[in-house]
């Protein structure tokens, strides 16, 4: 059986997502001998690290067996040895970056959300389809052990008719007090294309779609939890205070059990 290498450029390789999730996963696949295909061949990923900071890229590349790295996106997209462009960079500008990769004939795999608007997301998907390249978006939560077990139980009708579902989904994001912030500001700042709704709803949407069924409608209220929110203006600092707490209550008339 043949062994084939496939070049994958990771845009945003030194960020938290690029390093701790995606690069680590690719290196694990490499150490296991690559991905076994249905034909019996093995596909070996060859990561190429891309970012803005040469020093960080060099350190990360050395720590992973002297991988190739670059700060030149155009050069990477022009490299015939690279077949896949993966974007783990800031959400803002992702359609432009991915669109350039599609135009260069690269398959694209993107962190979610793939765009800030539905129109931009659909346009990107259609451009990839017209170009004849593969396009994909992260849906890693589907493969978590707990959710795969949930799906098995659902398929066997273990739950019977499901009347209501509650999902608590998230993790701690520190603001620098008292613990250091561990998420880049573009991930949560609306001004830079971020936000909890845009970032997190994309996760649970594919979970429900793939595990339980199609979503017919969504109702959402978004609020900022930190009590003090500042917005700088040329003359002064504008302070806004939010004193209300957010309370989640889910009443229903479906019995928990039969008595």
Where are these regions (language model features)?
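Rossmann-fold dehydrogenase core element
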Residues: 123-141, 160-167
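Short active-site oxyanion
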Residues: 44-48, 83-85, 195
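Predominantly a Rossmann-like dinucleotide-binding segment in NAD(P)-dependent oxidoreductases
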Residues: 141-243, 250-253
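N-terminal Rossmann-like dinucleotide-binding module
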Residues: 1-64
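Short loop/edge segments at beta-strand edges and connector loops
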Residues: 71, 110, 139, 220-222
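Beta-loop-alpha module in the N-terminal Rossmann-like domain of NAD(P)-dependent dehydrogenases
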Residues: 55, 63-127
């Amino acid at each position: 059986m043949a062994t084939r290498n496939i070049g994958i450029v990771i845009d945003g390789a030194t960020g938290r997502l690029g390093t701790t999730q995606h690069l680590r996963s690719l290196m694990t696949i490499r150490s296991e001998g690559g991905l076994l295909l249905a034909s019996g061949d093995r596909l070996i990923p060859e990561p190429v690290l891309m970012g803005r900071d040469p020093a960080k890229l060099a350190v990360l590349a050395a720590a992973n067996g002297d991988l190739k790295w670059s700060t030149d996106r155009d050069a990477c997209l022009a490299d015939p040895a690279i077949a896949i462009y993966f974007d783990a960079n800031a959400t803002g500008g992702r359609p432009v970056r991915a669109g350039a990769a599609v135009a260069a004939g690269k398959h694209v795999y993107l962190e979610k959300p793939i765009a800030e608007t539905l129109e931009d997301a659909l346009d990107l998907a259609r451009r990839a389809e017209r170009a004849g390249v593969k396009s994909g978006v992260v849906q890693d939560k589907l493969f978590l052990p707990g959710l795969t077990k949930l799906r098995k139980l659902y398929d066997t009708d273990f739950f019977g008719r499901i009347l209501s579902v509650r999902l608590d989904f998230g993790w701690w994001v520190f603001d620098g007090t008292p613990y250091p912030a561990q998420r880049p500001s573009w991930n949560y700042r609306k001004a830079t294309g971020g936000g909890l709704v845009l970032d997190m709803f994309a996760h649970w949407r594919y979970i429900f779609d793939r595990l339980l069924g199609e979503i017919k409608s969504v109702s959402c209220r978004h609020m900022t939890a930190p009590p003090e929110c500042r917005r700088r203006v040329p003359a002064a600092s504008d302070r806004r205070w939010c004193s209300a707490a957010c309370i989640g209550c889910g009443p229903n008339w479906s019995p928990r059990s039969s008595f």
